[in-house]
Swiss-Prot record:
It comes from Xylanibacter ruminicola (strain ATCC 19189 / DSM 19721 / CIP 105475 / JCM 8958 / 23). Keywords: Carbohydrate metabolism, Hydrolase, Polysaccharide degradation, Signal, Xylan degradation. It is an enzyme of class 3 (hydrolase). Residues 458-600 form the PA14 domain. Exists as a large polymeric species, presumably as a homononamer. Belongs to the glycosyl hydrolase 3 family. This is Xylan 1,4-beta-xylosidase. Optimum pH is 5.0. The active site is at D269 (nucleophile), E616 (proton donor/acceptor).
Length: 861
């Protein structure tokens, strides 16, 4: 194999005439010993190149090309033939850390399987987004529902985020006692990072109180470092108290390494070091920015122009020493040895994972199980749910009923199959009418003609997309895709235009011939970020070269039977990301009454609405009413959907509303216009089956909200204010649907808790009996909160334990929870530390964070 030949040649060069194994080539030595030896053989220029996220090969020493940047937010990302799980904010709603471990064990297996196939079976080389270092999990706190990246997190609570984050890391990295790590995971974005997206490169957070810093923003990072032994920490873009996070000695050295004992790698967010001198102006240029980041403790720079290329100049100018550089190089080399990436694959157990481990039936079953457990039943008037199969004709409508990209979330891979909500319902309900109804935000309806009236040059229905892994459409195409639904893709959030296509430096051509079945006006809608051109019958209609998503509308005035050859040419430009939307459609005004007329004789309507990852996400080129740059400016349901639901209610329909979103939606009007409300998040490849299972009673919902659902925009504090006052269940108690809330098709009764002194190092063991008093088997999540009675300025309550119990009808199960010293630890202003103070504490336990759902007892320390 090429790999073995490369290694053999490198060894020959290194051994020379002595034919003696060098220390760094000896797999029996520790990773640290090998890294120290290898570092000593590098030139300063080579060291600088190794400190980039895209590290080139150094053949003379047998060092291969290596990429530090890959993603596995909810499954292996940026590649095809993978298992796509629900978005993390939804998986947090499962309150099931054991199942979450299974999810990420599968994700790491699929990552290793594709890596092994490429590197060893195909004799290839490392690729960006396909390497063994994955920048997951995102353990920032979802403090404000307007943050577009909140969907990537495990919700608003520090404890829930910590517990779930530990399982993510363990699933990705594999057993600690293994010889090599399966992957390297990364806790991001350190620290105090949760929007806005549009200010992240310039923000300076100077209003974060010590209490909020230690009680809210830091616990998850500390837990992942100390309990999960996470191997990477990513420093964030913004400044904290005037210092960029990637240049903060306090964050990276004093807290992370000195206080918490972190021994591994710090990586920068992409472009964060360049922000020092381009946006924050805290450094004068790349050389000074580099020295600041390196001296503070940032080991690897992810970037575009790469400030770290100036590292040798910084050393020559005396801004830092080569000995300082060596500390960072040794850490990153330790990582590569720890992954087995530099050793013969026969020594690495993970290198034996075959490509057949990708996208298996077993992994799909886990995706389905997780999707079911994420679903939260928020409202069920008169027990309208579950529906009876085929008892009557029902309708399913709405913009998310048949929306595959919505199901996948952001930072996603592309699965081999996706079950939309429409697909799932169709599989159970034969008496069914489907009407798209409306767009997510637009008050026009686009009647798509791709599937019915468009034919590709090679005779297939729809639109053909041809892709090249260069920007000139040159040479052999990389891949081809076909579309019978509108194209809607973006590289923002690490999506790809086509499976396995790079997210940078590519080009595409989209082609079809449209034949008008009727005379009239049709439109070709093209919206893109990058360089894009539209040709109709060989004539150029426009050319755009732009970094911001730009919509275009080209009218086709057609006679019956008239043909139009349509071609869109695209190439990426050096922007944040690329995007493309294409549709050939008839533009119709929304007519609620016309749609309702089509529902004659139908009483029950499933409306699938909400928003989508194309509207909320990371630094996106979106600027429409309610949305800005990836964030939301309003948490209300988009007006077009709200009005549609009101019209259905006014027509006497019973509405089951399925909300798909990665964040909380203000649904107060919908509690009146809808009979049932189901929160489905972005549920992954099996999400349609999971939603249908819940709607028709094949699965009893047991998910609990991982975030607070507020009543309206007016309840939200200033988005740019990082104070926790008035935010989340910990400092706000007037929610529409509170954190930890979720209904079931059965009923549960929580018994009296039994609290005993622990003998295993914890303070107390807490046993809470729960009885299923209904007629259906179901699951209930018992939640334990602590209220510090001697701390009037502290949180109203803080989650400190939970357990999801599966309980058969008429049976009782017991939640067994532990309270440790850390469970009763809060910020103490007198000593400026987190500590457990003597005094009275309330233990609150029950089925949600709402006071009426909790019982309480008092303990004294």
């Amino acid at each position: 194999m090429k790999y073995q030949l490369f290694l053999s040649l490198a060894l020959c060069v290194g051994l020379g005439a002595s034919a003696q194994t060098l220390p760094y080539q000896n797999p029996n030595l520790s990773a640290k010993e090998r890294a120290v030896d290898l570092c000593s053989r590098l030139t300063l220029e080579e060291k600088a190149m190794l400190m980039l996220d895209e590290s080139p090969a150094i053949p003379r020493l047998g060092i291969k090309k290596f990429f530090w940047w890959s993603e596995a937010l909810h499954g292996a990302a940026n590649m095809g033939n993978v298992t796509n799980f629900p978005e993390p904010v939804g998986m947090a709603a499962s309150f099931n850390p054991h199942l979450l471990f299974k999810v990420f064990d599968i994700a790491s297996t699929e990552f290793r399987a594709q890596y092994n196939h490429r590197m060893y079976d195909l004799n290839g080389e490392d690729m960006k987004m396909r390497s063994l270092s994955v920048w997951t999990p995102n353990v920032n706190i979802f403090r404000d529902p307007r943050w577009g990246r909140g969907q990537e997190t495990y919700g608003e609570d520090p404890y829930l985020t910590s517990v779930m984050g530990v399982q993510v890391v363990k699933g990705l990295q594999g057993p600690e006692d293994a010889r090599y790590r399966k992957l390297w995971a990364c806790a991001k974005h350190y620290a105090v990072h949760s929007g806005p997206e549009y200010t992240r490169h310039t923000a300076n957070l100077t209003d974060v109180s010590a209490r909020d810093f230690w009680e809210t923003y830091m616990p998850a990072f500390k837990t992942l470092v100390k309990d999960a032994k996470v191997r990477e920490v990513m420093c964030a873009y913004q400044r904290l108290d005037d210092d960029p996070c990637c240049g903060s000695t306090r964050l990276l050295q004093q807290i992370l390494r000195d206080e918490w004992g972190f021994e591994y790698l710090v990586v920068s967010d992409c472009g964060a070091v360049s922000d020092f001198y381009e946006n924050h102006k805290s450094s004068s240029d790349a050389v000074h920015g580099t020295s600041k980041a390196v001296l503070a403790g940032t080991d690897v720079e992810c970037g575009f122009n790469y400030a770290y290329k100036s590292l040798p100049e910084a050393v020559r100018k005396g801004l830092l020493s080569e000995k300082e550089v060596d500390k960072h190089v040794i850490r990153l080399l330790e990582g590569r040895f720890d992954l087995g990436e530099m050793d013969d694959p026969s020594l690495v157990e993970w290198s034996k994972i075959p490509y057949s481990a990708m996208s298996t039936k077993a992994s799909a079953n886990v995706a389905l199980d997780m999707a079911r457990q994420t679903i939260v039943l928020l409202q069920n008037k008169n027990n309208i749910l579950p529906l009876k199969k085929n008892a009557e004709k029902i309708a399913i409508i709405g913009p998310n009923a048949h929306n595959e990209p919505m199901m996948w979330g952001n930072y996603n891979g592309t699965p081999n199959h996706t079950v939309t909500i429409l697909d799932g319902v169709k599989a159970k309900q034969k008496k069914l009418v489907y009407i798209p109804g409306c767009d997510l935000t637009n008050d026009k309806v686009m009647e798509c003609h791709l599937a019915t009236d468009c034919v590709t040059p090679d005779g297939k229905k729809g639109l053909k997309g041809t892709f090249w892994n260069n920007t000139e459409m040159a040479g052999k195409p990389f891949t081809t895709e076909y579309y019978t639904k509108p194209v809607n893709v973006t590289t923002a959030g690490m999506h790809v235009f086509a499976p396995n296509l790079p997210i940078e430096d590519f080009s595409a051509k989209y082609e079809t011939t449209f034949t008008a079945k009727e005379a009239g006006e049709y439109v070709v809608n093209v919206e893109s970020t990058g360089h894009f051109e539209l040709y109709v019958n060989g004539k150029q209609q426009f050319v755009n070269h732009i970094w911001r998503a730009t919509p275009t509308r080209t009218v086709l005035k057609a006679e019956k039977g008239q043909k139009f050859d349509i071609e869109v040419r695209f190439q990426t430009v050096k922007t944040w990301g690329a995007s493309m939307k294409i549709d050939v459609a008839r533009e119709l005004n929304i007519d609620y009454q016309e749609t309702i007329a089509q529902l004659k004789g139908i009483n029950k309507v499933i409306f699938c609405g909400g928003i989508a990852p194309s509207l909320e996400g990371e630094e996106m080129p979106v600027n429409i009413e309610g949305f800005k740059g990836g964030d939301r400016t309003s948490i209300e349901l988009p007006k077009v959907q709200r009005e549609f639901l009101k019209a259905l209610k006014a027509a006497g329909k019973q509405v089951i509303y399925v909300n798909c979103s990665g964040s909380a939606i203000a649904l107060q009007p919908e509690t009146e216009s809808c009979d049932a409300i189901v929160q489905a998040w972005y549920p992954g490849q099996e999400g349609g089956t999971a939603v249908a299972d819940v709607l028709f009673g094949d699965y009893n919902p047991g998910g609990k909200l991982s975030v607070t659902f507020y009543k309206n925009d007016q309840q939200l504090p200033d988005y740019e204010d990082y104070s926790m006052k008035g935010r989340t269940y910990r400092y706000f108690d007037d929610a529409l649907f509170p954190f930890g809330y979720g209904l079931s098709y059965t009923t549960f009764e929580v018994g009296e808790a039994k609290v005993e002194a622990a003998t295993d190092g914890a303070l107390y063991n807490v046993q809470i009996p729960v009885t299923n008093t209904g007629t259906k088997n179901g699951s209930e999540t018992i939640q334990l909160y602590i209220r510090n009675l001697q701390d009037p300025d502290g949180p109203l309550k803080s989650l400190r334990g939970f357990e999801r119990l599966d309980i058969k009808a008429g049976k009782t199960a017991t939640a067994n929870l532990k309270l440790t010293k850390e469970s009763l630890e809060f910020w103490d202003a007198e000593t400026n530390t987190m500590r457990t103070k003597p005094g009275k504490y309330e233990i609150l336990y029950g089925t949600s964070s709402l006071d009426k759902d909790l019982k309480k007892l008092t303990i004294t320390l």
